[in-house]
Structure formats: C-alpha cells, structure tokens
Amino acid sequence: MKPILISALTFIVFLTLGCREQSSSKIGTDELQAIFPKGELGPAENFTGRAWNFGLVSNDTTYTTLVGNVYFEPGARSNWHTHPAGQILVITDGVGYHQIEGQARQTIKKGDVVKCPPNVMHWHGASHESGLQQLYIIPNTEKGIVQWMHPVSEEEYNYTK
C-alpha cells in the first residue's frame, strides 16, 4: 500500500510542477490559443510589425457593426487612430498595450475589455515579449469606421508613465 501511495504523491507533485511551469511561460508568436483563422496581414501603412485581421461580422445596414479578430505578433501595434462611434476591444489571449492620447500606456491581457471613446486618438498592440489576440467591435458604422493617423514611435511604445 505504501509504494502505491508514494507513487501517487510523486505523480501529483510532477503534474503540479509541470502545470505551474507551463502557465508561467511567456506567450510568443506560436503559443497563443487561436480561436479564429489568422486572416489577412494588415497593411504596413496602418501597423508597425505584423498584425493579422480576420473579419467576423461584415458591415451592413441592419446591424451597423463591425466585429473581427486581430492577432498582433510580439512588438506589433496599430498606428494612432480614431473611431467616430468608438471601439470595444475584448482581449482573448496574450499581453499587450493600449494607450489613449495624453494618458499613460496601459497593459492589457486575456480577459480584459477596453472601451475606446468616440473620436479619441488611441493605439493598441502586443507587448515586446508576447503576441496579443483581440476581438474588436465597432458600433454605429453609419457614423464612419476608422481614421488612421501616424505610427506610434518607439519612444511612445516604450513609455510607461
């Protein structure tokens, strides 16, 4: 009986350590849990680094809402931009950053929900070490969808205050 108990306890200890090690590892390019296909590579004039967009709900006159999934590779980010009716981000995996003009950069992670107010300049993207996957929701598209601005500089991307 004692050898069975020792074997069972040893198995539980190794299982626990293995799970702990896996959960504390960094989330890089290939380690995010994909919910949707990667989609199309975002245009270089709107993104620094590689960001992939997969549309989920197309714009129409009934729902007037766009929904899609964006995957940012580590270090990738959007340009500064605005949305006439605002934007909601639901972070589904990874770690990244979001910043509203004039405010401190915020760290965002899986499970976070970010509300970008209408006509307020902001950017979002992956952290240095981790990819970021997000759902975006753009409501009231009859007001317009997005106005792209200039790229986020390295200084802005790295500035934490």
Predicted regions and their residues:
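Bacterial Sec-dependent N-terminal signal peptides
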Residues: 1-26
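A short, N-terminal "cap"/entry segment at the start of jelly-roll beta-barrel domains
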Residues: 19-64, 145-161
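N-terminal post-signal-peptidase region of extra-cytosolic proteins
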Residues: 52-55, 70-76
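Short, conserved beta-strand element in jelly-roll/cupin
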Residues: 69-73, 82-98, 137-139
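Ligand-binding pocket scaffold of soluble enzyme catalytic domains
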Residues: 76, 98, 132
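Short beta-strand His + acidic residue motifs that chelate non-heme Fe in jelly-roll/DSBH
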Residues: 80, 98-99, 122-127
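Short acidic-glycine-tyrosine-enriched beta hairpin
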Residues: 102-119
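A short hydrophobic beta-strand segment most commonly corresponding to one strand
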Residues: 129-147
